[in-house]
Design a protein with these regions (language model features):
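Residue-level signal for short segments within beta-strands and strand-turn junctions
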Residues: 77, 93, 156-158
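Hydrophobic membrane-insertion alpha-helices, especially the h-region
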Residues: 10-18
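A short, acidic/glycine-rich surface segment
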Residues: 92-98, 162-163
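Core segments of cupin and vicinal oxygen chelate
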Residues: 35-39, 45-90
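Positively charged n-region of N-terminal signal peptides that target proteins for export
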Residues: 1-4
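Vicinal oxygen chelate
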Residues: 17, 22-49, 68-69, 96-175
């Protein structure tokens, strides 16, 4: 009886020790793989010859509500349908330097969660980092390059502040 009890105790102790060791060694790695990196499209930016005419064309033919920055699409977040989300659409002058060092005529902005952690992770993975994180009332921004030389803007949005800024600028969203 004592032998069976000792064997059972050894098995339970080994299991607990192994579980504890596994938790210590792999803490955060499971969280990283479960971390949702991109949550949606934050913006679509492209170069054109005449941004003003381009905005007018989209307004006249496709019903966009445009201002000097382009247009904003308003939608509801899937994880919480009471929260608004926004996607910016903006034509830029063909001479803009904003997309550099990319030579492409477009840039996509991705909405992300926890930009600081994502940025550290991307650095560790060897992704080309173009700048440091910039903070604004309406969110945090950083830029990276993908493997084909496309500049990517990462945005951790503060949608409430973004909406407030839009109202101050007189923007009307597309719903």
């Amino acid at each position: 009886m004592k032998k069976q009890t000792l064997i059972a105790l050894a098995i339970v102790t080994s299991f607990c020790f192994g579980f504890a060791l596994n938790s210590i060694l792999f803490r955060g790695k499971e969280e990283t793989s479960k971390t949702k990196k991109v949550t949606g499209i934050g913006g679509i930016f492209f170069k054109c010859k005449d941004p003003k005419k381009m905005r007018e064309w989209y307004q006249n033919h496709l019903g966009f509500n445009t201002n000097q920055y382009g247009s904003v699409f308003e939608w509801r977040q899937g994880s919480d349908s009471t929260k608004k989300g926004f996607t910016q659409w903006s034509p830029f002058s063909e001479t803009t330097k904003y997309f550099e060092p990319s030579t492409k005529d477009f840039m996509i902005n991705y909405r992300v969660e926890n930009l600081e952690n994502l940025f550290k992770q991307l650095k560790n993975e060897g992704v080309t980092i173009l700048d440091s994180i910039e903070n604004y009332d309406y969110g945090k921004f950083a830029h990276i390059m993908d493997i084909e030389g496309n500049k990517i803007e990462l945005w951790e949005p503060n949608d409430a502040a973004y909406e407030k800024l839009g109202i101050q600028l007189g923007s009307k969203t597309i719903k």
